[in-house]
Amino acid sequence: MHLRTNPSICPGRRPAWTLWMCSLFWGCIVSSVWSSSNVASSASSSSSVSQAQYEHHFHGSKHHSVPISIYRSPVSLRGGHAGATYIFGKSGGLILYTWPANDRPSTRTDRLAVGFSTTVKDGILVRIDSAPGLGDFLQLHIEQGKIGVVFNIGTVDISIKEESTPVNDGKYHVVRFTRNGGNATLQVDSWPVNEHYPTGNTDSERFQMVKQKIPFKYNRPVEEWLQEKGRQLTIFNTQAQIAIGGKDRGRLFQGQLSGLYYNGLKVLNMAAENNPNIKINGSVRLVGEVPSILGTTPTTSVPPEMSTTVMETTTTMATTTTRKNRSPPSIQTTDDIVSSAECSSDDEDFIDCEPSTGKSGGELVIPLLVEDPLDIPPIATRAPFITLPPTFRPLLTIIETTKDSLSMTSEAGLPCLSDQGSDGCDDDGLVISGYGSGETFDSNLPPTDDEDFYTTFSLVTDKSLSTSIFEGGYKAHAPKWESKDFRPNKVSETGRTTTTSLSPELIRSTASSSTGMVPKLPAGKMNNRELKPQPDIVLLPLPTAYELDSTKLKSPLITSPMFRNVPTANPTEPGIRRVPGASEVVRESSSTTGMVVGIVAAAALCILILLYAMYKYRNRDEGSYQVDETRNYISNSAQSNGTLMKEKQQSSKSGHKKQKNKDKEYYV
């Protein structure tokens, strides 16, 4: 029989390896996606918790806002460079700036802007006077509760006033005044602009009106006189001093002035910097920097949004003055904390007060959030001590747990914790394994599935904790754990943590106590049987609780001292009652779980592909061969041997020739 290998099989094996590699590759990708999704979900859950905490702190910080001034300037005067703020008291004050004798300006155009807040009906805010004997002046004042400006540059007093709305409402306002010759504009906040123009359009027009009534021979001298007078009508000559507060004129201003600007001079800033040309008299206080409650950044009475100077917001010509509505300050006045300067009163702008010297008058009253003492954290793994109410009395101290105390405790009434009825409590009851951790629980409380945030007892792992959650609780002292002195199934000496199981007698004795007074069970041994010591056990993972025969695992409470302040859900199984309360579950990381699942899925897929390939290749012909099914019958012995041999030789030659021809044809 002639067998030959078909070369077409080799190319057929390459796709199998390719599929195997592709399956492994896609399995890794799936596992990566799985792990990333798990990590994202865990991150979102953790971020939700942190967000809740953050929101809690945010609402808490709302009661500790930074002290702000009662009166706050709008955007036009905001910023550290915009201007200082002074408060003028009841008795009045004066800030006087005097130009040097050789540096007194004469101006054709003036710009004045100031922020203020007051409740007085009459008072002078700012007055600029020329040198003695000239009589030129410019005065910003409040009359009958309305703001106005009066100026005289050589002939008559020119008045411009805001008639629409009073400004002595205690709110903060910004007034802007511009003068160009005899033309003037006045604007308060973003209200409509008030304008003033002389009767004649130009000086020449006024001269032509007067020239008709003057004799011809006097025209020339009158023209020269009018031209000289015209210069006096447009120029504010030899300005000498700026008086702020009105005390020198007997019209006292009471309230707050901020960011005074006049022709490039920031007078209040200069006063705050102790400029030698400025004198301050009377009841005038500078609103200085108030330290922040948080102790991070200093805060002044002027909000930080004031970033533009008054110069940038003043108008120059009435015809081109346009104002947009200003947005209100981002910091709104609340009733939480209102602090202006150094006085604790709300109307200290008008009442004299002294700077705070540590007394109660200058203190900031900060409301504190006091939480309900009953709402203590569900799991306090690092709390050193929680004070017990006086009504709570200890029932058992685990540090003093001995054989005698355990035997006495076993006689007390305790509820049946097994799934069976009141008459069926036996050795199959639930084993309590607290390992002396100070866990307390209420057996009358139903087990819940949302112990992540609401639990019924506290867990102590590596520090002493005195705690009590419910009425009638006890004090538990858990010493610091170490792996070398930790024995899960041995009653240790005084001061050692212990682990026990509930005895059947103890369980049966109190099957019907759930409807009565809620008992409190300490996490410790309830019987006094001495068990064999076990080898040293590492805390992670915690050893499981054993029954009395130490051979069968029985639904332990899974705890982990490495989880700090992270309550987790209590795992439940069908048919098994858990101790209500919080218990921490040791979980693998999401990324590891996803990777393992992906690798297992990829391996299973590869195995299936290999099995399928083996099944296919098993049923496939592995080579080409030919079977000669011709039948040769033995002739009678009477026939000659020569004839038979010839036939055999011919048949063999013909068959070999056909085979050779077929092979040659096949390979070609």
UniProtKB/Swiss-Prot annotation:
Recorded topology in the membrane: Single-pass type I membrane protein
Chain ranges of the Laminin G-like domain: 84-284
CC terms in the record's Gene Ontology section: membrane
PROSITE patterns according to UniProt: LAM_G_DOMAIN (PS50025)
Annotated segments matching region Disordered: 510-529, 636-668
Post-translational modifications reported in the UniProt record: Processed by alpha-secretase leading to the formation of an extracellular soluble protein as well as a C-terminal membrane-embedded fragment (CTF). Proteolysis of these CTFs by gamma-secretase releases intracellular domains (ICDs) and extracellular peptides.
Residue spans, topological domain Cytoplasmic: 615-668
Stored SMART domains: 4.1m (SM00294), LamG (SM00282)
Pfam families: Laminin_G_2 (PF02210)
Extracellular domain ranges by topology: 36-593
Primary location: membrane
Signal peptide: 1-35
Transmembrane annotation, as ranges: 594-614
Tissue-by-tissue expression: Brain and arteries (at protein level).
GO annotation, biological process: angiogenesis; cell adhesion
The entry's keywords: Angiogenesis, Cell adhesion, Membrane, Signal, Transmembrane, Transmembrane helix
Cellular compartment(s): Membrane
Family: Belongs to the neurexin family.
Function: Neuronal cell surface protein that may be involved in cell recognition and cell adhesion. Plays a role in angiogenesis.
Protein name: Neurexin-3-beta
Species name: Gallus gallus
This protein's encoding gene: NRXN3
